[in-house]
Amino acid sequence: MQQLNPSEISEIIKGRIDKLDVTSQARNEGTVVSVSDGIVRIHGLADVMYGEMIEFPGGVYGMALNLEQDSVGAVVLGAYTSLAEGMSAKCTGRILEVPVGKELLGRVVDALGNPVDGKGPLGNTETDAVEKVAPGVIWRKSVDQPVQTGYKAVDAMIPVGRGQRELIIGDRQIGKTALAIDAIINQKNSGIFCVYVAIGQKQSTIANVVRKLEENGALANTIIVAASASESPALQFLAPYSGCTMGEFFRDRGEDALIVYDDLSKQAVAYRQISLLLRRPPGREAYPGDVFYLHSRLLERASRVSEEYVEKFTNGAVTGKTGSLTALPIIETQAGDVSAFVPTNVISITDGQIFLESAMFNSGIRPAVNAGVSVSRVGGAAQTKIIKKLSGGIRTALAQYRELAAFAQFASDLDEATRKQLEHGQRVTELMKQKQYAPMSIADMALSLYAAERGFLTDVEIAKVGSFEQALIAYFNRDHAELMAKINVKGDFNDDIDAGMKAGIEKFKATQTW
């Protein structure tokens, strides 16, 4: 019988161990304790971070939102029907990231950045964190460049600047989305990249928005992030942050971007749903205590950053350029109640609001902008010179008209001055009306405002103000194209432009019909 040498045995074992090809991974692993309504409770994940991605079997991911003493509450990103009690859950050591870059322009993606438009994969894109800290005070620059929405009522009375947060607020079906979409359409030649985030909307509505942007040639410089009503609350909650990260890509590289959140009321509802399922204590209107922070940390990321910030971020690749991300958040009110919890929160966070009123909309004044309640806190410094010069009396005329119209209902006879003021107010109200998907250029807008400001509408019938304006703009674009081009390029207002407009309108009124 052959004798085995103990040293040989150890050599054989050692050789086998050396040849064994095993890649070991040190991972924090836990067990799923319960699964319900998209919320998973996990036991045993001791080292998990807040907001960390958690991997489940079958390539399903979750996000840790509740870190408790003996368990972790996570929200599942996507379908949770394949998960069951007893399954393993692993920490990934990563926080949620989404694709960013110019490859996303013209595409429709979900809240995680996956394309959903059937146009194939995105290609090689960078990724960036969904949750980021807003630029500090030192890196910011004041707002002094305009974002033209193409609406007279907005650009004349409630101007929006690059890097501003301007809230669009009003009841349902009143033209909030229409205003935001027109603002995006108006950017197709302005060099501003756009991001449209649809939260909790019908898929047919999102498809309609995509079609309209495509028809108007604005889809090529727009990213659409869609978290429709059929998506889980987790994705509806994350969509605005994902869209913001995509917009910040342009801001941080010295470009200008515009982001529309449509709408943040539905994001707050989705977050409330998640919080209640995670058993967090409810507060006012059953919203969790941090619902203000939900919106403030999102909207603070919209800003205008300095040349130094862009240079530092790009490691000197881009110099001498400021970047901006302008936000147009939308909030839906119930029966015009702006004092509800979420509307008051967002009003206090933003730099002004455009208030759309049901009564005006129903009486045919569209866009239904209530100039009295609407305000732009920083946009005045960014307004185009010619619009600023000519729009001074418009807001006053409308405010006085509304005040006098209320008194005129009770007065039997009015003096001449009051009657003139009322008629001027009616004409200005007519002039502020504008068709959907027809944003105006600076020159067209300036011409309309000039006609109102300098009294050229006084002898025009109130019912014919709209047709007068259309005919006047068509006449100037045909016979005074050079003057209009000059206004569009420079946006200045001087004696030559004043004289040119005056002479042109006088000739138009003498020779043309409308």
Swiss-Prot record:
Just give the chief location class: membrane
Which residue positions hold the site described Required for activity?
Answer: S374
Q: What Enzyme Commission number(s) appear in the record?
A: 7.1.2.2
Catalytic activity annotated for this protein? ATP + H2O + 4 H(+)(in) = ADP + phosphate + 5 H(+)(out)
Q: Where in the cell is it found?
A: Cell inner membrane
Q: Name one GO molecular function term.
A: ATP binding
Source superkingdom: Bacteria
User: Under which main EC class is this enzyme filed?
Assistant: translocase
The answer to whether UniProt assigns keyword Membrane to this entry is yes
Q: Which UniProt keywords apply?
A: ATP synthesis, ATP-binding, Cell inner membrane, Cell membrane, CF(1), Hydrogen ion transport, Ion transport, Membrane, Nucleotide-binding, Translocase, Transport
Annotated Gene Ontology cellular components are: plasma membrane; proton-transporting ATP synthase complex
Q: How does it sit in the membrane?
A: Peripheral membrane protein
Entry keyword annotation includes Membrane:
yes
Residues recorded as binding ATP, renumbered to this chain, are G170, D171, R172, Q173, I174, G175, K176, T177
Please give the HAMAP family that the UniProt record associates with this protein.
ATP_synth_alpha_bact (MF_01346)
Its function?
Produces ATP from ADP in the presence of a proton gradient across the membrane. The alpha chain is a regulatory subunit.
State the family it belongs to.
Belongs to the ATPase alpha/beta chains family.
Assembly notes: F-type ATPases have 2 components, CF(1) - the catalytic core - and CF(0) - the membrane proton channel. CF(1) has five subunits: alpha(3), beta(3), gamma(1), delta(1), epsilon(1). CF(0) has three main subunits: a(1), b(2) and c(9-12). The alpha and beta chains form an alternating ring which encloses part of the gamma chain. CF(1) is attached to CF(0) by a central stalk formed by the gamma and epsilon chains, while a peripheral stalk is formed by the delta and b chains.
Protein name (record): ATP synthase subunit alpha
